[in-house]
Amino acid sequence: MESRSVAQAGVQWCDLGSLQAPPPGFTLFSCLSLLSSWDYSSGFSGFCASPIEESHGALISSCNSRTMTDGLVTFRDVAIDFSQEEWECLDPAQRDLYVDVMLENYSNLVSLDLESKTYETKKIFSENDIFEINFSQWEMKDKSKTLGLEASIFRNNWKCKSIFEGLKGHQEGYFSQMIISYEKIPSYRKSKSLTPHQRIHNTEKSYVCKECGKACSHGSKLVQHERTHTAEKHFECKECGKNYLSAYQLNVHQRFHTGEKPYECKECGKTFSWGSSLVKHERIHTGEKPYECKECGKAFSRGYHLTQHQKIHTGVKSYKCKECGKAFFWGSSLAKHEIIHTGEKPYKCKECGKAFSRGYQLTQHQKIHTGKKPYECKICGKAFCWGYQLTRHQIFHTGEKPYECKECGKAFNCGSSLIQHERIHTGEKPYECKECGKAFSRGYHLSQHQKIHTGEKPFECKECGKAFSWGSSLVKHERVHTGEKSHECKECGKTFCSGYQLTRHQVFHTGEKPYECKECGKAFNCGSSLVQHERIHTGEKPYECKECGKAFSRGYHLTQHQKIHTGEKPFKCKECGKAFSWGSSLVKHERVHTNEKSYECKDCGKAFGSGYQLSVHQRFHTGEKLYQRKEFGKTFTCGSKLVHERTHSNDKPYKYNECGEAFLWTTYSNEKIDTDETL
C-alpha cells in the first residue's frame, strides 16, 4: 500500500479502491454553492472533513492514481516553502496571499495536465489552520476519465451543511478514495471562513479601496492592493536593494540576478525562470486563447491581458503619477512610467554593460549578443527574437488592421501603434530629454536621442568595425556587406533592406501625402519628413559637431559630416575599388557600372539613376525655382546653378593654405596642390 505525507502531522493518504464509511464522530460537508448543480451520475463538486472531536480518521475522496498524468512541470517545481519559524512571522494577510498564489499555480498546472490530481505539501500551517483542496468533478472508475480541479481554502472556524446522508446508495463501485489518518486535529466551533469562499461564486466584492474605488472579494486582496498606493514594500533584495510587496515577488525577482531558467519549451527550446511563464509561452505555439471578452468577443491567451483589455471598454484609469499627473489603467504601467522621472536603470547587461529600466528590455537586448531567433513564421519561414514580433509579423500575411484612428481613418495592426499615431494629431510629447529639454511622442525616440548626448555606440560591425548607437542600425548596416534585400515591392519588384524603406517606397506608387506643413502647405509621405522640413522654417539645428561646432537639422547629416574629420571610407566598390564614406554613395556609384536607371519621369519618360536627379529634373516640367540670388533677384531650378554666379560676384570661398590664393571651386584648389607637388 503506497503512502504519501500531507499537511498535518502524522497524516497519510492511502488508495483503498472502494468507498468506506467514515469513522465515528466525522461527517462529510460541502460548500452550498458547489452543490447547486448536484448530479450523482457525473460525480459531486467536492467536500471537506469537519473535525468535531478527536478521532482516528476522516474520509476524503481523490482521483484514481492510475490515471494521473506525468507532467513536465510539477507543483513542487513552482512551490515556495516556509519553515515553521518563517510561517509564524507572516501576518494573516501575507498568509492569505501565499496560499492564494500557491493554489492558483496548482490549479493552472492541473488544468493543462501538467500536474497530477493529488496535492502534497509540508506542515507549513499553524494549529489554527486547515488546508483543503476540492475536486470540481470526480473520476468514474468505469470510464477512466481524468477531470478538472477546483481549489479553495477553509481556514480557522467553519461549518458546512451535511451531504453524507444524500450519498448513501450511490457510492459503491464509482470512485477511488483516500483515507487521512492522523494523531490529532483541533476542533472548531464558530463559522467564519466559509463566507469569503462563497464570494467567489456570487462575485460579491464588498472590500472597496478608498484611494481609487477598486472593489475586492477578500480583505487580504484589498490589503495587497492598497500597497500599490502606499508603496509599502517590506521585502528587500540584497543584490540590488529593490523592494517588493511580498516574499513571493522578491523570490521571483531574484531569478533575474541568478539567471536560473529550469523550465524549457519542447517546441522551440526557450527556457524560463518560472513554470507559469512556460505555460503561458506554450500558448504561442498552440494558439490557445481561453480568456474571452464578453463585451466584444476578443480572446486572449492570458487572463492578465483580458483584464487589461476590459479597461478599454470601461475607460477607468485609476493609477495616477504624482510627478506629472498622467493616469494609467494598471499599476504596472504607472510603475514603468515613474522610471522616466527617476532615470533608474537597475537591469544591466553582463555582456556589454548596458543598463535598462525594465527587465524585459534586458531580456530583449541579450538576444542581440546571442543572435537566437526561436520564433519562426510558418507562412514565410522568417524568424524573430521575440514572440510579440512574430505575432505582429503574422498580421502582414492576414492584412488585418482592426485599430482605426477616429481623426483620419488610418488603420493599424495593434493598439499601441494607434496610440502612438494619435499623438501626431494631439501633438502630445510626454517623453522629455533632461539634457536639452527636447520632447518626444515615444519613449523609444527619447532613448535614441539620449545617445546623441552620451555618444554611446555599443554595437560594432564585425566586417568593417563601424559602431552604432542602436542594434537595429547595426542590423541594417550589415545588409550593406551581405547585399541582403528581403523586402520586395509587389508593384515594381524593387527590393529593400528594411520594411521601413519598403513602406516609404510604396508611397511613390500611391502618391499619398497625408502630412502637410502649416507654414507653406508642402505635403509629405511620413511624419518624420514633416518634422525635418519644419526645421527649415524654424531654423532649428539640434545636431552639433563637437569637432568643429557646425550644426545640422538632421542627425543623419551630422553623421555624414563627421566622416570628413575622420576620413573614414568603409564602403568599397567591388567593381573598381573606389571607397566611399556612406553606403548610399556606394549604391549610387554602383549604378555607373550597371547603368541602372530605376527612377523614371512620368511626364517625358526619361530615366535617372537616383531619386534626387529625378526630383531636380521634374522642376523643368513644373517650372519650380527654389534657389534665388538675393543681389539680382534671379532664381534657379537647382542649387548648383548658384555656384555659377560666383563668376559674376568674384566670390572665391576656397583658399589654399600654403600661399593664401583663393579659388571659385574646389577642383581649382586641388589642381594647385598637384602643381606644387610636381614642382
Swiss-Prot record:
Family to which this protein belongs: Belongs to the krueppel C2H2-type zinc-finger protein family.
Renumbered zinc finger spans (C2H2-type): 205-227, 233-255, 261-283, 289-311, 317-339, 345-367, 373-395, 401-423, 429-451, 457-479, 485-507, 513-535, 541-563, 569-591, 597-619
InterPro entries: KRAB (IPR001909), KRAB_dom_sf (IPR036051), Znf_C2H2_sf (IPR036236), Znf_C2H2_type (IPR013087)
Protein known as: Zinc finger protein 283
This protein's GO CC annotations: nucleus
Transmembrane segments: none
GO biological process: regulation of transcription by RNA polymerase II
Domain KRAB: 73-152
Tissue: Detected in prostate, testis, and pancreas.
Crosslink position(s): Glycyl lysine isopeptide (Lys-Gly) (interchain with G-Cter in SUMO2): 280, 476, 588
Localisation: Nucleus
Cross-referenced CDD domains: KRAB_A-box
Any matching Pfam family: KRAB
Sorted UniProt keywords: DNA-binding, Isopeptide bond, Metal-binding, Nucleus, Repeat, Transcription, Transcription regulation, Ubl conjugation, Zinc, Zinc-finger
Functional note: May be involved in transcriptional regulation.
Main subcellular location of this protein, as a coarse class: nucleus
Organism: Homo sapiens
A GO MF label: RNA polymerase II cis-regulatory region sequence-specific DNA binding
